[in-house]
Amino acid sequence: MGADPLRQAPPLAIGTTLVPMTELTLENTRTVEVFLHALQDADLDTAGAALADDLVYQNVGLPTIHGRKRAIKLFSSLGGASAFEVKIHRIAADGAAVLTERTDALIFGPLRLQFWVCGVFEVHDGQITLWRDYFDFFDMFKATLRGLAGLAVPSLRASLSPR
């Protein structure tokens, strides 16, 4: 008998049940990590390669963006005047679905807005088809206030620890 494909990766403990990680689940998790870090590195070629042509990108509460080209156009329009940083605190996957708990930072010159985000990604055939982020608008408001205060008092600026 051949090797059990569900035993290719070590199982994860959930409560008292062991849930085996499949190779596909690991690949999907890696796709999301590579994508987010490519955005951080302003590597839009790598980021774009991780997105499906028919991507649906939604920041809940804001307009939905449809398509890889439109998403990459949005990121490139932010260009040299801004930067993005990410710290992934937790990442979990089940088949095509990948969930992230992270801190994102949007940086516009000396203004830094840092806030928590939970993201849902769906990955099919090695490409992200759905990217839906949830964040708290009040948390974003506080990040804006802290960012503005950090302009006057640099010690108040938020920062992410290294990945």
Which residue stretches match the model-derived regions?
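A beta-strand edge to alpha-helix "cap/lid" segment located at domain peripheries
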Residues: 18, 22-23, 76-163
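Short, low-complexity N-terminal intrinsically disordered segments enriched in polar/charged residues
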Residues: 11-49, 53, 158-163
